UniProtKB/Swiss-Prot annotation, chain B:
This is Proteasome subunit alpha type-1-B. It comes from Arabidopsis thaliana. Coiled coil: none annotated. The gene is PAF2. GO terms for biological process: ubiquitin-dependent protein catabolic process. It is found in: Cytoplasm; Nucleus. The proteasome is a multicatalytic proteinase complex which is characterized by its ability to cleave peptides with Arg, Phe, Tyr, Leu, and Glu adjacent to the leaving group at neutral or slightly basic pH. The proteasome has an ATP-dependent proteolytic activity. May play a role in thiol biosynthesis and arsenic tolerance in association with PAF1/ARS5.
Length: 246, 277
């Protein structure tokens, strides 16, 4: 069993055990990849609706992309309960921002940096929020897309992906993304990435949502499925090249 | 104002609903040397009269940079002003650090006002004895605010505080309607002319005033002596009715010694009219 020795008053071993159990050690219910791109009018973000419990695809109706304030979208992979906690923090933040009622509002850049501070500080206390977050938004005509990991690594880019998306989707995006994609082309590109993830990521399910954010606001699509093709000839006799295997 | 039995504590109301200690704090602001602020849609200019304790000492700093997009000019107890400037810098930098974005000046002045209000409601504290002219930017452009020891704050197109500020205010009242659309250069000129009003007879020299500017796409900075003198030269050449005869000719540096009577600026401000701010 791996334990960290947290240097506190050594006389009370019961208290040490309690403190250990308060920290996040491993995730339980997790979401898989998020893929997001900047396009002509703003940002598009795609995710499936699955929540895995280890290797079981247990929950199939989890929204992993949410609108934040007027100008931003937040997508998360990793521990779902930590994502809900983050949504509560952001709720408080945007509420206080609205209460000022002074014509100033938090844009995607501010929220991204706030989240970076939160994630990094939690990591420093050895109690991370077990998520990789994607923050996209539009404010005053400028699109913004950034990412924060559970250890506080944070950056901006024209296209981002989390988890398996980094390995399977980013190469496609590096080849095929270009500035000023139309909405239709953007969706097609995201669907291409999501299809590859569906085929190859074991924790992906075939029920996805694509969210769009523009200067006008946020729209999250209804859940839908991708068409898949399983009739490849090699699937008919998969062991043709290696007799005896399964 | 005269002494009365309700003015010992800040936590004592008078029967007419006044807090005298707070009002006395506002008097302290009127004793400080003048500070002036003006703003246009995109720029804010803060200017002040340099006052020195004696001829031997250097003058006190009255304008502080809070951030690239916020500056503050103070009048009154400069020690209180220094402490509050440090608070403002701290708030500003903490916001920048967390959000990577400049703190909107409107929110900063509310924090400042709330801080001042606390001192009007604790028996073991005293109100800050300094008035602050805060100029800064937020999403909707340039703003100028005045923060009072009472914990109130107001937004202004142009304002002046400190001794003989009424003269400057009279000048500003005549011209403020044009400020919103003014160019930066005109705004600076108006600020220096307003400073001249508070000097009431003393020759206006660049060594007597400090001027600072900030704007959209222009971080807070001070104007150097040369630039100020250049602006002074543009209007000191034109003799106006208010000016004393014999002053204000076309000399680039004002003649020393011939500055006339009333040379001292700082001490003995009993001639300050008890005006309402």
């Amino acid at each position: 069993m791996t334990t960290f020795t947290v240097p506190i008053d050594n006389g009370d071993s019961v208290r040490i055990a309690e403190e250990e159990s308060q920290r996040t050690l491993y995730p339980y219910v997790t979401g898989t990849s998020i893929v997001a791109i900047k396009y002509k009018d703003g940002v598009l973000m795609a995710s499936d609706m699955g929540g895995s419990y280890g290797s079981t695809l247990r929950y199939k109706n989890i929204e992993r992309v949410k609108a934040i304030g007027k100008h931003s979208l937040l997508g998360a992979s990793g521990e779902i309960s930590d994502f809900q906690e983050i949504l509560r923090y952001l709720d408080e933040l945007t509420l206080n921002d609205n209460m000022w009622d002074d014509g100033n509002s938090l844009g995607p850049k501010e929220i991204h940096n706030y989240l970076t501070r939160v994630m990094y500080n939690r990591r420093n206390k050895f109690n991370p929020l077990w998520n990789t977050l994607v923050l996209g938004g539009v404010k005053n005509g400028k699109s913004y897309l950034g990412m924060v990991s559970m250890i506080g690594v944070s950056f901006e880019d024209d296209h981002v992906a989390t988890g398996f998306g980094n390995h399977l989707a980013r190469p496609i995006l590096r080849d095929e993304w270009h500035a000023d994609l139309s909405f239709e082309d953007g969706v097609k590109l995201l669907e291409k990435c999501m299809r590859v993830l569906l085929y190859r990521d074991r924790s992906a399910i075939n029920k996805l949502q694509i969210a769009k954010i523009t200067e006008e606001g946020v729209t999250v699509s209804q859940p839908y499925s991708l068409k898949t093709f399983w009739e490849f000839s090699s699937f008919h006799n998969p062991t043709a090249g290696a007799e005896g295997s399964w | 104002m005269f002494r009365n039995q309700y003015d010992t504590d800040v936590t004592t109301w008078s029967p007419t609903g006044r807090l005298f200690q707070v009002e006395y704090a506002m008097e302290a602001v009127k004793q400080g040397s003048a500070a002036i602020g003006l703003r246009s849609r995109s720029h804010v200019v803060l200017a002040c009269v340099n006052k020195a304790q004696s001829e031997l000492s250097s003058h006190q700093r009255k304008i502080f940079k809070v951030d690239d997009h916020i500056g503050v000019a103070i009048a009154g107890l400069t020690a209180d002003g220094r402490v509050l400037s440090r608070y403002m810098r701290s708030e500003s930098i903490n916001h920048s650090f967390t959000y990577e974005s400049p703190l909107p000046v409107g929110r900063l002045v509310v924090h400042l006002a709330d801080k001042a209000q606390v001192c009007t409601q604790r028996s073991w504290k005293r109100p800050y004895g300094v008035g602050l002219l805060v100029g800064g930017l937020d999403e909707s452009g340039a703003h100028l605010y005045y923060n009072c020891p009472s914990g109130n704050y107001f937004e202004y197109q142009a304002f002046a505080i400190g001794s003989r500020s009424q003269a400057a205010k009279t000048y500003l009242e005549r011209k403020f309607e044009s400020f919103q659309e003014s160019s930066k250069e005109d705004l600076i000129k108006d600020a220096i002319m307003a400073i001249r009003e508070t000097l009431q007879g003393e020759t206006l020299k660049s060594s007597l005033c400090t001027v600072s500017v900030l704007g959209v796409d222009e971080p807070f900075h001070f104007l150097d002596q040369e630039s100020i003198q250049k602006v002074i030269d543009t209007f000191e050449k034109v003799p106006e009715e208010e000016e004393d005869a014999g002053e204000g000719e076309a000399e680039p540096e004002a003649a020393p010694g011939a500055a006339g009577t009333g040379e001292q600026g700082g001490s003995g401000d009993q001639d300050v009219a008890p005006m309402e701010i």
